[in-house]
């Protein structure tokens, strides 16, 4: 592998996960709201024009029979745990981007199943068997997680879209610049006439860094079909850890979650003090019987400020 060769990745995407997790009947017009805007809508609701980002009042005007639900992130995460558990049978390296979307490196699983497509189809079979008719699953495979994510959106009725190795940049090129998902940066790029990922990728990396800084550099790497950050070539910082001895032992999950949040805040502060960011977090829980459950969450917005991390 070359110094900056992207990681071959698979993304498993369960569309409309907030709707699926709500367990509402699939043929109902349903919208899940957060901050008074639609974050997910069922196929029936979309047919009436209820789409992501629409305000509550307008969505109800477009679809008077709309069933409105408030978003419950915790419930979505709990429901998605079953999907992650199924994928654990394929690989132990599943990273949760958010409930409804996971990514993992394909090297081991693809070799075991005889190729990227066979591996992706197996993912579809396992997850679809779990979800049944209430949900769908799409799998994208490409060089780098960003390209694999967009490939999962292109899977369509076949449920699988594989971008050949080395072809991620050309696959990404026609996508609109908005696919980067960074509104402020995208707005500037669009005003400069850069309407596609390909036009942005064609710029010199040095020019991008000089004009747009670190955020532009990350976005430029994504547009070029590379990983968000180049492989580390410097020594990692000294080991940092935070710990809390709990006596008597915790018996409730909410108590453990509270302690975990306090420790996470302390750790983030230490990272901030060193000018570092967090790109992944691994949470491990061990029971009194020695059973261990491990989950890895990927933080794709790790370039944002510490204050923003705390706020979200």
List PLM regions with ranges:
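Structured, non-catalytic alpha/beta "coupling" segments that mediate domain-domain communication
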Residues: 119-160, 217-218, 222
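Compact, charge-rich alpha-helical regulatory domains located at protein termini
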Residues: 157-226
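Alpha-helical interaction/regulatory segments in DNA maintenance proteins
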Residues: 68-81, 204-249
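Conserved small/polar residues in nucleotide/adenosyl-binding loops
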Residues: 307-312
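Short, hydrophobic beta-strand segments
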Residues: 101-108, 244-246, 294-297
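C-terminal extensions
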Residues: 171-179, 226-286
């Amino acid at each position: 592998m070359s110094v900056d060769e992207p990681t071959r990745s698979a993304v498993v995407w369960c569309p409309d996960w907030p709707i699926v997790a709500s367990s509402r009947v699939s043929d109902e017009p349903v919208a899940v709201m957060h901050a008074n805007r639609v974050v997910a809508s069922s196929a029936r609701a979309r047919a009436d024009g209820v789409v992501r980002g629409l305000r509550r009042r307008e969505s109800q005007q477009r679809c008077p029979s709309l069933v409105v639900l408030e978003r419950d992130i915790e419930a979505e995460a709990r429901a998605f745990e079953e999907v992650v558990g199924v994928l654990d049978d394929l690989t132990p390296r599943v990273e949760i981007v958010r409930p409804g979307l996971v990514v993992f490196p394909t090297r081991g699983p693809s070799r075991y199943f005889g190729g990227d497509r066979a591996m992706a189809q197996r993912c579809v079979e396992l997850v679809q068997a779990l979800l049944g008719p209430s949900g769908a699953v799409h799998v994208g495979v490409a060089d780098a997680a960003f390209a694999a994510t967009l490939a999962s959106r292109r899977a369509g009725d076949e449920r699988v879209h594989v971008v050949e190795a080395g072809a991620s940049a050309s696959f990404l090129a026609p996508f609109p610049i908005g696919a980067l998902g960074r509104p402020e940066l995208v707005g500037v790029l669009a005003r400069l006439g850069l309407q596609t990922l390909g036009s942005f990728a064609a710029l010199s990396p040095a020019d991008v860094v000089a004009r747009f800084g670190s955020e532009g550099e990350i976005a430029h790497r994504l547009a070029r079909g590379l990983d968000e950050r180049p492989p580390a070539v410097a020594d990692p910082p000294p080991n940092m850890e935070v710990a809390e001895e709990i006596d008597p032992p915790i018996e409730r999950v909410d108590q453990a979650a509270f302690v975990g949040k306090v420790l996470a805040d302390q750790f983030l502060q230490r990272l901030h003090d060193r000018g570092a960011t967090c790109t992944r977090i691994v949470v491990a829980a061990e029971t009194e019987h020695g059973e261990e459950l491990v989950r890895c969450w990927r933080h794709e917005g790790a370039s944002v400020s510490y204050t923003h991390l705390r706020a979200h």
